C-alpha cells in the first residue's frame, strides 16, 4: 500500500485509517543479521507497530567517499533490515543522522571530519554541510524505495538528534530537511529533544512532529508529557526516547532500572494518551571498535567517584532493554507488555516465551604471535615527525598507534610523564620491555627508570577507546595528542609512528611452538580452532585476559577489559560453523592463558 502518515491532535492515520503508534528502538548495526528476525518477532508479540533505528554515518562512510552498506557480515545491510521489518508488518521510524549520539564513536559522525583547530559540526558550516550532502545522496538512494509513499515501511524520518541541547541554528535543521527532501524523502519529519521548553524551541522546526526524551519514572513521565502538551497542543503526545535503561561504562558500577518502575511509568504515559517509543527495546553490541565515550560524571551509585572524567562505553549495548543483548525478553518486557495489552483491551497473557538456545565450549589456544614481530605484516602507515601525530592525522579511525622515540643516556635516572597526552590508553615499553600502562584520567604516577649511556628506545602503544559522543566535546583527537610528553621535564622530539588499525589479521604469522613465559605482559595475538553447533549463540568469558579485542571467524566481536563490569562477549550463532571455527584474541598485556571458555549466559554486571 502507498500512503503518508497523517498527524493530528488526536493521533495518527495511515492509509486513511487510524494508526496506533507503539514503537521501540532496535539498531540493525548492533545485532548480527542472523538474530534480526528473533527480536522483530518479539516486537510483534509485544504489540509494537513500528521500529525506530538510527543510521550510523561513521560506519557507512568510514573513509570519505567510500560507502559501506554491508559491514563485516551484513550488520550494515540497511536494506535487508527494512525488508525484514516490512515482511513482519512493522513500520519504521528512521533516524538518518548526521549526529545520532547513541553512545557511538563521535556520536555517529565520521572521524575524517576532524581537522585540528576547526571542530565545527552540527551547523551550517559549508564544509560540514557539503559532507552531509554527499552522504545523504548515497544514503537516500539506499532507503527511498522503503518510504511509505513508495509502498514501504518507513513512515517518518528524524532531523538530527536532541539538537536543542546543542545549538539554536534553526537554519541548520531546515537545511537538513531541504537536503533530505531534495533527495526524494516525502514522508513526515520529526525531532526529539530532552524534555525542556528551551530545548524544544531550539531543536524543532515548524511542520515537524516534536517528541520529548526522558527517563522511565512515573514522576518524570508526567512532568514531561504535561509540558509537551502545553508547548505543542496541536499534535499528539510523542515520546521519542522512553529511556527504560542506560548504557554501561568500563570500570563503573552498574545499576539496572527497576522494571516495575518502568512499567508504571509506561502506564502513566499511555493513560495520558502518549505514543511511546522505548529506548532501547532490544539491546545489542558495539561490534569492533565502534563504541563511543562520555566526558562527564558517570551514572553511578558510588558517590566518591561521581566527578567528571573520561568514561568509555562497554562493548555490550544491552542497555537494560526490554530484550537483552542475548535476544531474550526480560521481566521488563513482560510487565510492559501487560500494560499495553490492558490499555488496548487485550486478554492477559502468560509470561513465557522460549528462551534462545545457547552453548558452552572450551577452546585451546594453540598458536601465538607477538604484535611487535608482526608490525610489517599488519601495520599501516609509518611516519616520522618531530612531534607525534594524532591517529586522525595518520588517516586512522580506530585501533592502535605505536609511538617510538630514542632517549639519550645522559641521566642516571629518568622520570617519564605523559601530561594530558594519552588518548586513551598506553602500554609503555623500554627497549621492548613492558614497564606499565597509562590510562586517560587514571590518576597515573610518573614512571621512573634508568637510561644507560647507550640510550634507550621508548615505545608507547596507544589505543583509542572511543571518541566522546556528548555534544560539548565532539571532535576530540586520539593517540598522543600533546607535546607535553616529558622526560625529566624535558620535551621529547622525533617520533616514529606506526598505524595499527587491526582491520585485517590475515597476514599475522602465528607460531604453534610458542613459550608463553616469553610473551607475558606483551601485546600478543592468540589463536585456536574449535567445533560448535552452528546457529547457536554463546558467550566468551574473558576471565584471565587483560585488555584487547576478540575475533571469531574474522568478525571483530568487540573489546574486552578486566576493568569490568562486562565479563563476557556475545558470539551470535550466525557466525559459527559446525567445524573449522577460528578464534583470535589480541591481549595488550598477555597474562599466560592458553585456553578460553565459552559460556551459556551473558555476564554483564
Model-inferred region functions:
Residues 36-105, 177-182:
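Aromatic-lined substrate-binding rim segments of carbohydrate-active enzymes
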Residues 1-50, 83:
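N-terminal carbohydrate-binding accessory modules
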Residues 215-324, 328, 339:
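Catalytic-core region of carbohydrate-active enzymes that cleave or remodel glycosidic bonds
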Residues 74-94, 117-154:
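An active-site-proximal structural segment forming one wall of the substrate-binding cleft
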Residues 414-430, 458, 530-553, 560-561, ...:
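Aromatic-lined ligand-binding clefts that engage carbohydrates, nucleic acids, or primary amines
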Residues 65-73, 97-123, 173-177, 207-210, ...:
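Aromatic- and acidic-residue-enriched segments that line the glycan-binding/catalytic groove
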Residues 128-205:
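Active-site neighborhood of glycoside hydrolase catalytic domains
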Amino acid at each position: 500500500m502507498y500512503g503518508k502518515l497523517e498527524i493530528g491532535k488526536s493521533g495518527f492515520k495511515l492509509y486513511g485509517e487510524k494508526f496506533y503508534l507503539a514503537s521501540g528502538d532496535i539498531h540493525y548495526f548492533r545485532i548480527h543479521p542472523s538474530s534480526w528476525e528473533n527480536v522483530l518477532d518479539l516486537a510483534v508479540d509485544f504489540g509494537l507497530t513500528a521500529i525506530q533505528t538510527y543510521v550510523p554515518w561513521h560506519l557507512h562512510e568510514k573513509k570519505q567517499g567510500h560507502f559501506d552498506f554491508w559491514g563485516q557480515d551484513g550488520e550494515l545491510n540497511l536494506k535487508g533490515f527494512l525488508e525484514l521489518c516490512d515482511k513482519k508488518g512493522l513500520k519504521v521510524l528512521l533516524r538518518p543522522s548526521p549526529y545520532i549520539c547513541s553512545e557511538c564513536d563521535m556520536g555517529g559522525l565520521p572521524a575524517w571530519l576532524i581537522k585540528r583547530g576547526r571542530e565545527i559540526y552540527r551547523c551550517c558550516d559549508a564544509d560540514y554541510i557539503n559532507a552531509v550532502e554527499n552522504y545523504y545522496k548515497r544514503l537516500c538512494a539506499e532507503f527511498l524505495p522503503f518510504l511509505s509513499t513508495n509502498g514501504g515501511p518507513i513512515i517518518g524520518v528524524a532531523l538530527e538528534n536532541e539538537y536543542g541541547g546543542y545549538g539554536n541554528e534553526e537554519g541548520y535543521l531546515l537545511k537538513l530537511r531541504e537536503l533530505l527532501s531534495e533527495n526524494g524523502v516525502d514522508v513526515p519529519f520529526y525531532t526529539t529533544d530532552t524534555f525542556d521548553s528551551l530545548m524544544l524551541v531550539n531543536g524543532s522546526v515548524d511542520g515537524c512532529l516534536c517528541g520529548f526524551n526522558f527517563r522511565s519514572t512515573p514522576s518524570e513521565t508526567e512532568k514531561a508529557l504535561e509540558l509537551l502538551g502545553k508547548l505543542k497542543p496541536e499534535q499528539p503526545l510523542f515520546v521519542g526516547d522512553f529511556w527504560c535503561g542506560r548504557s554501561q561504562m568500563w570500570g563503573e558500577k552498574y545499576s539496572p532500572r527497576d522494571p516495575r518502575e518502568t512499567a508504571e511509568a509506561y502506564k502513566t504515559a499511555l493513560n495520558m494518551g502518549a505514543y511511546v517509543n522505548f529506548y532501547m527495546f532490544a539491546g545489542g553490541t558495539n561490534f569492533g571498535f565502534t563504541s563511543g565515550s562520555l566526558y562527564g560524571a558517570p551514572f553511578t551509585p558510588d558517590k566518591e567517584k561521581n566527578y567528571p572524567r573520561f568514561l568509555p562505553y562497554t562493548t555490550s549495548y544491552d542497555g537494560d532493554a526490554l530484550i537483552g543483548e542475548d535476544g531474550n525478553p526480560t521481566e521488563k518486557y513482560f510487565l510492559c507488555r501487560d500494560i499495553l495489552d490492558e490499555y488496548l483491551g487485550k486478554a492477559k497473557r502468560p509470561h513465557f516465551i522460549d528462551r534462545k538456545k545457547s552453548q558452552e565450549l572450551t577452546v585451546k589456544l594453540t598458536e601465538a604471535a607477538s604484535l611487535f614481530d608482526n608490525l610489517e605484516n599488519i601495520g599501516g602507515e609509518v611516519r616520522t615527525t618531530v612531534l607525534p601525530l594524532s591517529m586522525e592525522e595518520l588517516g586512522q579511525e580506530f585501533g592502535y598507534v605505536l609511538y617510538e622515540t630514542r632517549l639519550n643516556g645522559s641521566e642516571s635516572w629518568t622520570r617519564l610523564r605523559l601530561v594530558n597526552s594519552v588518548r586513551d590508553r598506553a602500554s609503555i615499553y623500554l627497549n621492548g620491555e613492558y614497564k606499565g600502562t597509562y590510562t586517560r584520567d587514571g590518576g597515573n604516577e610518573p614512571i621512573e627508570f634508568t637510561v644507560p649511556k647507550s640510550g634507550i628506545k621508548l615505545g608507547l602503544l596507544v589505543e583509542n577507546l572511543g571518541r566522546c559522543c556528548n555534544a560539548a566535546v565532539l571532535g576530540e583527537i586520539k593517540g598522543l595528542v600533546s607535546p607535553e610528553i616529558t622526560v625529566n621535564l624535558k620535551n621529547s622530539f622525533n617520533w616514529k609512528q606506526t598505524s595499527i588499525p587491526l582491520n585485517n589479521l590475515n597476514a599475522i604469522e602465528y607460531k604453534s611452538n610458542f613459550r608463553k613465559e616469553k610473551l607475558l605482559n606483551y601485546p600478543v595475538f592468540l589463536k585456536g580452532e574449535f567445533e560448535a553447533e552452528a546457529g547457536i549463540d554463546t558467550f566468551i568469558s574473558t576471565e584471565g585476559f587483560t585488555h584487547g579485542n576478540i575475533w571469531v571467524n574474522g568478525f571483530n566481536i568487540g573489546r574486552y577489559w578486566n576493568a569490568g563490569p562486562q565479563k563476557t562477549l556475545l558470539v551470535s550463532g550466525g557466525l559459527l560453523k559446525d567445524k573449522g571455527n577460528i578464534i583470535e584474541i589480541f591481549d595488550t598485556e598477555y597474562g599466560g592463558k592458553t585456553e578460553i571458555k565459552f559460556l551459556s549466559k551473558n555476564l554483564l554486571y
